[in-house]
Amino acid sequence: MTSKINEANTDIKEDFFRGLHNGIPICLGYVSVGFTFGMMCTENGLSFLVAVLISLTNLTSAGQFAGTALIISGGSLLEIGITTFVINLRYMLMSLSISQKVDVALSIPKRMLMSFGITDEIFGVSMQTKGNISFAYFMGLMILPILGWSGGTLIGATAVSLLPDMVRSALGIAIYGMFLAVIIPPARTERAAAWVIAIAAAISCILYYVPFFSGISSGWMIIICAVAASSIAAVLWPAADEEEANA
């Protein structure tokens, strides 16, 4: 009995440290983006404590940036809520996918804790795991990225005042680089993805430059562009059924 317990504890430790190791590259990538977020917050009047708290409780990259930008611009609660919901809706699908690879006996509190740490990168790495995803592995995988995201936010929020204006201006475009890194790879391989990007960009330009739509806030523009572009793509380029894809 004792040997079995020791073996189980060893497996848990091995899974945890394997996840910790796999989370290192994600952590390093998140530091730079978190730095940009922290800089954005303090330059727009939010304290570094608020910036770090947002990062610790969100961990949603694009949704976090969009939601915070709306807070800074004075957007309504409804506007902020719908915008972040639409942008973060993909996490529901990721959670459903991961739920198929965890032990059915895993408790709901542990499942909820795992769902908190799901990001695009963590999801991608975890889904490459052969067999089931253990709770210990996922905890190890999400710890360093959370620390990297929050730590980067803290550094950016506190150190930005020490940087020259030229450097601060250059770092300000880092978020756009992050978004380009997200959309360009799928656009190069999937025609539908490229069209979704083009349609969303066209709608955004119309809403921004046509005087008739000048009363629409940036938050509602994001919602309209996302819903309209994805709806058009769903009609014109519906996803093939699994049976058709495997045929």
Q: For each of these PLM feature ranges, what is it?
A:
Residues R168-I173, G215-A228:
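Loop-to-transmembrane alpha-helix initiation sites
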Residues V235-A247:
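Membrane-interface capping segments at transmembrane-helix boundaries
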Residues M1-F17:
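Short, Lys/Arg-rich, polar N-terminal cytosolic tail immediately upstream
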Residues T189-A194, I206-I223:
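Extracellular/periplasmic helix-loop-helix junctions in multi-pass membrane proteins
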Residues S3-A8, G81-G172:
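Helix-loop-helix junctions within the multi-pass membrane cores of secondary transporters/permeases
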Residues E43-G45, L49-V50, I54-L89:
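Membrane-interfacial helix-loop connectors
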Residues N88, R168-A198:
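Selective transmembrane alpha-helices of multi-pass membrane proteins
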Residues Y30-M39, A62-F65, N88-L96, E121-V125, ...:
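Transmembrane alpha-helical segments of multi-pass membrane transport proteins and ion-pumping complexes
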